[in-house]
Amino acid sequence: MSIRDAISRDDLVELARKVASFKSDVDNEGELAAFLASRLRHQGIEVHDEDVVAGRPNVIATVPGRDSDQLPLVINAHMDGAYHLTGWSRDPLEGWIEGDKLFGAAISDMKGGLAAMVATIEAASRQRDLPRDLILQAVMHHDTVGLGAKYVLASEGPYEGYGINGEPSNMKVYYAHGGAVKFRITVRGQAAHVSRIEDGVDALQAAVTLYQKLGSMTPTGKRIEDLPDLPTVFVGVLNGGFAAGCVAPTAELYGDIRTLPDMNRKTVYSDLAQIIDENRVPGCEYEIKITAAQKGLLGKPQSTIITAIDGAFRKVRNQGAEISKALPTQAFVTDGADMAAAGLETVVLGPGDWKYAPDEFISITDMHDAALIYLQTAYELPLR
């Protein structure tokens, strides 16, 4: 049997359409998790599904290898998937095909990658000749903090081996990406009617000043060659006030800083506090709240896992893997960071060129090739 026959392209497409039909965008991975666990168990695969919080489980599937002493390969995908809610030409929960494109809700981030990894573990179960254990971690609540991945890695590992995180990297291999710190700044002033503006303290104007300054701030952090475009600072929400004829008593900014390895919530908080101190408006009170934080991934451009993936690419695509450190994946946050922190030699490799937009799609060829490459990598990794 040729490598390409190990996983049916048509079956994978139908699986991906089914996965995309589950609405799992906001705290609601339970139905998708139940479907995956049932499907895998029906094929005789060892499955552990455990609630991380009520109704929101991880699904961990394991296909044992011939030799349990060999280092395992972990493939990781998240089940939560946000998607653009308006502007679609068809129902996003009913995926459709046009040429090599599969359209559907959250199909590139990362329902397509998840389906590819499920197909990989199923194919490994059928072949029954893996040299090492292959573990699928289908996790809940990736969004920034990676709660599902942190839970399974802390509770059962593995703490040694290799990992592939399947976030959409457009089939390029990334060994490094930044972290993230998200924040909210609340400004409190004093309300006043438009006829008595002098009695008020305008929180919205104070927040606008911060918005302008934050856009040009340079966070404290040591620049590194592997993450040349970081750090970045972005404020995505600015709101305040409650009436057209009233001085705004409160305003809020919500921002996102993509970080370098020596940056963390404490350094970001300090940088934000300095910006506030330099632009403080008399009569205003300021509050900083760090709302989420996640570490980055910093591996090496030459590693055992990259060599194995390159070998898999050559067998599946007749060409080597492309190693990249470019945007946008450089500014992603992935569960690969937690996999590496747990002790796994980890890279990011997944199908899809992610864009949060209506009519989101994924290349069917890339999705199929990704599944085959994940499977072949388990064979390419060296024995010890």
Spans of model-derived segments:
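Short helix-capping segments at alpha-helix termini
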Residues: 43, 126-130, 157, 278-283
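A structural signal for short hydrophobic beta-strand segments in well-ordered beta-sheet cores
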Residues: 47, 61, 95-97, 235-238
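Acidic-glycine-rich active-site phosphate/pyrophosphate-binding loop
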Residues: 82-98, 160, 175-186, 347
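Acidic/histidine-rich catalytic neighborhood of metal-dependent amide-processing enzymes
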Residues: 110-182, 383
